């Protein structure tokens, strides 16, 4: 039996929590405190309007300070009570004929344990706008949409230790890939889309594949019923996401990654910083 089939069999039989090990302190490593952001470019495919669309995705990971009582970025962290977070932005611009889906999801994850403190999502195309916010201080999910369904909804959502699907590309980087084998988790379905809905919380099985994975990556399988995601993370720290085969049929493949103060790169020609394949 192949190593992949053996892993899938182990996933099916995995008891809760077995050998799912997280590395303490991932969010406090020195790389996140160098005053720069990690900006990664992915070649992306996404199912939209009955076709697979080709685009690029941008991931941004950067350390920030949130005002503790409000969960907004502190203008002056030195004079405010703050929470240190890793902010993960997932930015999309997906073409569909005449118009594009312009979308961005932000996860604000506490540096200790990478648990999200807040998640926001915006999506717009020529039909209208949608906005989502989840907050850990109220455990409330707020949806605002142009569409009748979902329309305007405020719903309770307490993760109770479940992982947000939309945060996995960041949170799974905190795994101890050498010690993790297989185990069961709970996953909160995606809210990233033009018609977001109150998500379901599903049982999931996770497993790490090392020996059969391509050189230089750890392969992580996540199964939720008949939905399967496969992530490939670089073996070297900080374990950037190299590839993601998603359960909806979409894919992300890493093309370029740099550390930079992107908020200062506003001059004509600065776009070339992301044009050269490779990692820096």
Residue positions per predicted region:
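Sec-dependent signal peptide recognition
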Residues: 1-8
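Intrinsically disordered, low-complexity regions
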Residues: 8, 154, 185-188
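Hydrophobic h-region of N-terminal signal peptides that target proteins for export
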Residues: 8-17
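General structural signal for secondary-structure boundaries
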Residues: 12, 163-167, 235
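Acidic, serine/threonine-rich low-complexity disordered tracts
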Residues: 17-142, 177-280
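Surface-exposed beta-loop interaction hotspot
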Residues: 134-182
């Amino acid at each position: 039996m192949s190593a992949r089939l053996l892993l899938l069999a182990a996933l099916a039989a995995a008891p809760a929590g077995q050998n799912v090990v997280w590395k303490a302190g991932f969010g406090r490593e020195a790389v996140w405190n160098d005053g720069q952001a990690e900006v990664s470019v992915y070649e992306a495919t996404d199912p939209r309007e009955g076709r697979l669309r080709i685009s690029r995705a941008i991931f941004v990971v950067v350390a920030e300070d949130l005002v503790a009582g409000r969960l907004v970025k502190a203008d002056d962290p030195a004079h405010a009570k703050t929470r240190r977070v890793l902010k993960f932005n997932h930015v999309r611009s997906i073409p569909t004929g005449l118009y594009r889906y312009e979308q961005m999801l932000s996860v604000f994850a506490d540096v200790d344990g990478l648990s999200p403190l807040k998640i926001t999502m915006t999506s717009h195309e020529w039909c209208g706008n949608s906005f989502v916010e989840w907050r850990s201080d109220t455990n409330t999910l707020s949806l605002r949409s142009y569409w009748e369904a979902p329309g305007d909804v405020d719903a309770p959502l307490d993760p109770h230790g479940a992982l947000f699907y939309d945060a996995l590309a960041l949170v799974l980087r905190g795994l101890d890939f050498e010690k993790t084998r297989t185990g069961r988790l709970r996953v909160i379905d995606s809210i990233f889309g033009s018609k977001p809905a109150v998500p379901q919380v599903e049982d999931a099985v996770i497993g790490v594949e090392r020996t059969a994975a391509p050189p230089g990556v750890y392969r992580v399988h996540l199964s939720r019923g008949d939905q399967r995601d496969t992530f490939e993370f670089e073996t070297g720290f900080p374990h950037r996401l190299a590839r993601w085969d998603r359960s909806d049929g979409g894919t992300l493949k890493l093309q370029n990654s740099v550390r930079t103060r992107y908020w200062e790169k506003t001059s004509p020609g600065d776009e070339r910083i992301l044009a050269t394949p490779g990692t820096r």
